[in-house]
Amino acid sequence: MIALLALSSPLAGSLAGQSQASPSGQISGVVSDQTGAAVQSATVIFSRGSFTATQVTDASGKFVFSGITAEAGVVRTSAAGFQTSDTDWRSGSGPLEIVLRPASAAEQVTVTANRTGVRLVENATSVVVLSGPDLDATAAFRLDDMLRQVPGFSLFRRTTSRTANPTTQGVSLRGLGASGASRALVLSDGFPLNDPFGGWVYWDRAPRESIQSVEVASGGASHLYGSDALGGVINIIRTPPDRNSVSLEAAYGNENSPDLSLSASRKMGPWSVGVASELFRSDGYIAVPESLRGAIDTLVNSQDATGDVTVRREFADRGDFFVRGSVFGESRHNGTPLQTNSTTIRELDFGGNWDAREFGAFQLRAYAGRQNLDQSFSSIASDRNSENLTRTQRVPAQQVGFSVQWQRTVGTRQHLVAGVEESNIHGQTNEQGYFNGLPTSTSAGGGREVNWGAYAEDIIRIAPDWLLTASGRVDHWLNFDAFAPPNPAVPVGAASLPDRSESFFSPRLAILHKLTSNISLTASGYRSFRAPTLNELYRGFRAGNVFTEANSNLRAERLTGAEGGAIATGWNQRLMLRGTYFWNQITRPVANVTLTTTPSLITRQRQNLGSTVSQGVEMELSGQVSNSITLSGGYEYTHATVTSFTVDPALAGLNPSLVGLNVPQIPRHQFDFQARYSRPFILLAVQGRFGGNQFDDDQNTLLLRRYFTLDATASHSLRPGVDVFVAVENLLNRRYDVARTPVLMVGPPILARAGLRLQFGAR
């Protein structure tokens, strides 16, 4: 709380009349709202230089400091739902009369994706926050589909995680170029969800009913989070098991799609236990358009189950400790009889938070997990009436890691953050080759990766209307015990590869200037990086008739970026508008580069391109039109192109220069909107999403056409805590392009479901 107050802006507050002088060495006063009502439990901090003292207002809004030897200082007052007030005080003045103004919705939202709580309107980073009500009002029931309402969010392909192969579920922000590996870090309560071997994300691991909110922070974040945060951070905040509560949602939809999500907790004194689980299955749909289908085209579908148990121990107001065990499993059919995959994950997490008073606050996170991915690939005849098994893979991986963070407020104008992290990953791919249905060769590739990082951040209010943030992080990573088959045709054996290491320094400087009580300007510059995953280094894959080779010589991607924008609030703080211009250059981006093309097979390899540049503008608008109607929307224009590329001389005729071409999978325009009508017993909401043209390949020959989709949901409360609802995704039933492999694949048809939601206790 003190850290939050130290960062809060002196937006409002007034000192009314000064009556008789307070006794020497004493500061007294009363805190009220604009109606004159007393504000109870407001936090009042007096500061002078490095000296600070804290009091809390009583039921009548009064506070008293005694034993004050300073002649002058600043009294900062804060309370939930109100703007923070700064009041100058001098010895001999009368009791203070402090009036607090209500905070806008944006001012009440605290963002934690930057490792410390900062109010949304005081954050120089572009952040979109989806609250619990926002998530409840979304027709989508997979987290990645919910996040598509955030401008700039995209996966490797447009396909939803309901049916997409998990290795295509890497996330991209701001047009940095999606691939199997994410270019943004996804966290759940501070623990990474990115796959340790491949960098993609299993979006179903966090049960939907256990999610309290989601923060999407765009822009390079390696200065705090290291390699995986090249383009930003997605922070999933789980509901803590700090009260007796039950939240259950059960639904059934077409495509034979049942879904059950549960979150429950029980508090017993300082101890509490939380349970969360989700079960889902769907028969899916045929992804190939009817005019192109053959005998082997079958349903793409999936089923998954996830569950976790959390045990938590609180220590009064000093902190807590918790342990969480989780399991996850899924299986998928990928559109033909022979193409399938399945995954199992088990993980154990530990965490603790401790307030050491004047020594600061400490946070610990540690985790260990193991997993296994099984997958099969086939070659498909040109008439799509037959297929042959070409390869099966088993990919085991293990990871362990920890992070320790310290933060402390210095006076009322400065906040310090520092921490260290380490992760250790071990993974390999074991492959069996087939020809004419018979096994022909075995091969293996993999290795170990260790990452170390240390970071520090200084957030300082250099003037009442200026907030400066300076941060930096040093990372060093090492790949060792690596091996790969010297040639896919070699029957058995693997060649050892030399150890490799790299280091990188990620600085960031950001500033926020409050022009008026309603308008702020922001600017920042940063560098970020992403080390190649074990998957990119050592595992190839096949999608349709496109085979992508691994490359053990890949080096880390490096990003240099800058952004500037403005935040404006108005209409009695019921309207917020945020606009940002961004520019990002990536040197050595890892891309799937086409090597050869034949009618039956396209061969690509992961390579470090020369460089790409992504620049554009993003806009976010939200408004509370009335007590019942909320409107919001976002738009992003992104111009992402290849700016340098070295052609392989041996393939110059087949592999022309890519300079000037668009980065694959990135549309030029994205737009979304949401409209919500809510009353005590009814909720109506619609969400629309538009995506412009984009290309599925590096040579810009496989076009995915623009699309628009509309979702809607309605719910009715039968009694407090008991709701019935209907939700429809793709209300217009438009089968838009999602991939070309090179055969066109289209997205899901309309999905309608109905269900029951039970909520007892606060979510």
Predicted region positions:
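Membrane-embedded beta-barrel scaffold of Gram-negative outer-membrane proteins
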Residues: 362-379, 512-514, 520-526, 530, ...
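Face-selective signature of the C-terminal outer-membrane beta-barrel domain
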Residues: 312-328, 344-490, 496-497, 512-514, ...
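Short, acidic, small-residue-rich periplasmic hinge/interaction motif at the N-terminus
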Residues: 24, 32-37, 43-44, 78-82, ...
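Extracytoplasmic beta-strand/coil segments of soluble accessory domains associated
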Residues: 127, 144-195, 212
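Periplasmic-side early beta-strands and strand-to-turn transitions of outer-membrane beta-barrels
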Residues: 222-223, 235, 243-251, 263-344
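Short acidic/polar hinge/loop motifs at secondary-structure boundaries
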Residues: 191-218
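Gram-negative outer-membrane beta-barrel transporters
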Residues: 468, 476, 574, 578, ...
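Conserved C-terminal beta-signal and adjacent last beta-strands/turns
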Residues: 314, 458, 523, 557-562, ...
